[in-house]
Structures are given as structure tokens and as C-alpha cells.
């Protein structure tokens, strides 16, 4: 059977949001099955649907794919968003990993223990401003093109846009000294599929607030 | 210029060892420039050689590739150890990510604060025995083949062998109830390139003891 991919995850961004973004940018419609209780998760495990007892899991082309990177790589390859040869893929992979590292750092802030929050927030801001954003500003400056790799849209442009939106939510002033990244953000945001995903009513997920996290923590005991 | 890949990292396993393993299994000779002082690391950064100011970094085919997964993907593609099509690659990626997750968990034990060590060791043992090894035993059982994916050697067989050797060092009893994994370990270990890498005098790195870690911690302030 083929048909739409089915995404299994919580009703939250977490480690699924980059997959939603990539599918949306590729113009692929998808269904979501939300895990709303520990029993839902237990059932997925018991039925042998989760290779390592974890989500994200995506049903696609007859497979039950787990692991964020495996899912992203498959979608990027299938929809030709992964460069034209292995050298372009190497750049795309290197940039993607940097983006995932910083995204993870920022995401972790919402679930980090209160006594560590200040130090971790300061570190995340420092890394954003002094390590990651300068690296990507430099890439754009080096070739002067509209996209990061190969002068056309690839997965990494979508990953970077997603990150820039999180950085903006986190502390918009962090973007001030990166004119090329700001232009990149508007440019990618205006691509038709992306524009659609950015509009209200799409399957994009909103940030969770402290109260929602408390509730999720009680239900899923993390 | 081409020539041998040059690996930049500390004289330790860390996040470079899986790259050493993959190159060795592919029969590729490589050079290592070991980082022996904070000044060595500072120089690499200052010269603009590290995209995100981090190692591992590998000079290969004119690129200065950072990020473990980007490096592994490039080597696996170049030396045809990445499956025959995108569905095989999806399995290889999913399995590889599970292996990297458990490897990271075991590696982190040596540098974790003493007061957390007991709990983290127990968790790592539990995950090894009840999550990861059963998942791979099941894959081997499901198809009865010698290799994990596509009935021939791929990167993921090398990653799994490396993990099984770490598990054995960690607590050999964890392997007892997995006969197919034990047979897999002997089988992959006897492949000529792998056998050579397993012999003393190769570029494989030994486990560090507590004293070496203390010294590294002082020098590199982690």
C-alpha cells in the first residue's frame, strides 16, 4: 500500500517538527496519529511498530521508519532535496548536523531543570550568536547564491529556515547582525509550499508553554 | 590534491573511532593529526578549518568535513557501503542511529560525574539488554542472512561490530542471550580488513582508564 505518510508522535514539535517541515516543503500531504496517553505509546511498542521503542516513527512506502535522521534522509532522497552528487550531500549533511545540534540545544531549554535554565540559556545564546549563525552567514556570503548548497533548494534550506524561526522566538535580537540570514529567511519563507505551511491552520506545531509541559510531564513521566 | 584522508581528533576513541573503523573496513589508509594541547585545537579554529569549531574533522577529497554523521555518510557512499537503493539506505540509517545512540550512552559513562555513575550504568545495561541488542538479534533472525541489510557488507555491519566490542568491554555477560549477535561478531571480525584493524599496532584506539581521562580533562577543560 502506498498513500500518504503517517506520522506517529505527540501533538508537539519535538523531534518530529523537522520532518513535518520537510514534507510540507516537498509538497507532500501527510496524516498524523497523535500519542495522547501512555497507553497509546504502549500499544505502538507492544505491536512491534517501534524498532527502538521510540518515536518519531513514520509509516512510508510500506516501511515503519524510526529515527529522525533516517526519516529525513529518506524523504530528502525521495523528493530530490538532497543535492546532485555525494560532495553536495556531504555539505548538506555537515550543515544539517550543525543545525540539528543548535535546534536540540534550544529545544532542551523548555524541559531543563529550573536551576540549570539560566546557564543553559546563556550558553545557547552564545552558541547561536558566536558559532552557528556566523558559520551560515559565511556560507551565504562565500557564494552569494540564494540557497545554501548547489544554487537550488535542498533540505538544508528548510532546516535552516526552521532554526531561524526558533531563534527568532527565542531572542529576535540574536539575528540582528546577520543580514544575509535575514534575507534568506524572507526568501525561503515566500516559497509557495513554505508560505502555505507558515499560515494558520497548517500542521505546523506551536511552542508549548510551561503549563503544557507540566501536563505532558505528568502523563508521560519524563 | 587527493591522497590519504587526514583525521583531526584527540588520541582517543570519542566521536572519531567509528570513522576510523569505517575507513579501515573499507581498506582505506588514513593519516591522523592528533590534537595534543589546547593550542593545537585553537590553531585549527583560528585557521578556519572547523566549520562549527568542533572536531572530528576529516580532510578528504579537497573538503574539510566536520560532523561525524556527515563524514560517515560520505565515506560509506564513496566506498559503496551504503546499500543498493534508498530503501536499503533507510534501514541502514535507522539501524546506524540506534547503534550511535547506545554507543554514545556507553561512551558518556566514562566522563559522567561520579554521583550519577551508578544510575547511568544501570540504565545503559538495561537499554543494551532490553532495547538495542534484542532489536538487532531480531533483524538477523528475521532474514537469516550474514549481514544486516541486503545480504552483503555495509557500514551498519561495521558500526554494529564496533558496538558489540564496546558492550563486551562494558559487561560481557550482556551478550549471553544473543546467539545470533555473537555469531555475527565472530563473522565480521574475521573479514580480512577488519581482522587487520583488530590486531595490535593498528590505528584502533584503546579504552581510556580513569587516570588518562583526568589528564585529558585538565588539558582540555571539559
Swiss-Prot record, chain A:
It catalyses: RX + glutathione = an S-substituted glutathione + a halide anion + H(+); prostaglandin A2 + glutathione = prostaglandin A2-S-(R)-glutathione; prostaglandin J2 + glutathione = prostaglandin J2-S-(R)-glutathione; (13S)-hydroperoxy-(9Z,11E)-octadecadienoate + 2 glutathione = (13S)-hydroxy-(9Z,11E)-octadecadienoate + glutathione disulfide + H2O. The modification N6-succinyllysine is found at residue 4. This is Glutathione S-transferase alpha-1. Glutathione binds at residues 9, 45, 54-55, 67-68. The modification N-acetylmethionine is found at residue 1. Transmembrane segments: none annotated. GO terms for biological process: epithelial cell differentiation; glutathione derivative biosynthetic process; glutathione metabolic process; linoleic acid metabolic process; prostaglandin metabolic process; response to nutrient levels; response to xenobiotic stimulus; xenobiotic catabolic process. GO terms for molecular function: dinitrosyl-iron complex binding; fatty acid binding; glutathione binding; glutathione peroxidase activity; glutathione transferase activity; protein homodimerization activity; steroid Delta-isomerase activity.
UniProtKB/Swiss-Prot annotation, chain B:
InterPro entries: Glutathione-S-Trfase_C-like, Glutathione-S-Trfase_C_sf, Glutathione_S-Trfase_N, GST_alpha, GST_C, GST_superfamily, Thioredoxin-like_sf. In addition to its enzymatic activity, the homodimer of Ya chains, called ligandin, binds various organic anions, xenobiotics, and azocarcinogen dyes. It comes from Rattus norvegicus (Rat). The modification N6-succinyllysine is found at residue 4. Signal peptide: none annotated. It catalyses: RX + glutathione = an S-substituted glutathione + a halide anion + H(+). Residues 85-208 form the GST C-terminal domain. Residues 3-83 form the GST N-terminal domain. Its main location: cytoplasm. The keyword Cytoplasm applies. Catalyzes the conjugation of glutathione to a large variety of electrophilic compounds. This is Glutathione S-transferase alpha-2. Homodimer or heterodimer of GSTA1 and GSTA2. It is found in: Cytoplasm. GO terms for molecular function: dinitrosyl-iron complex binding; glutathione binding; glutathione transferase activity.
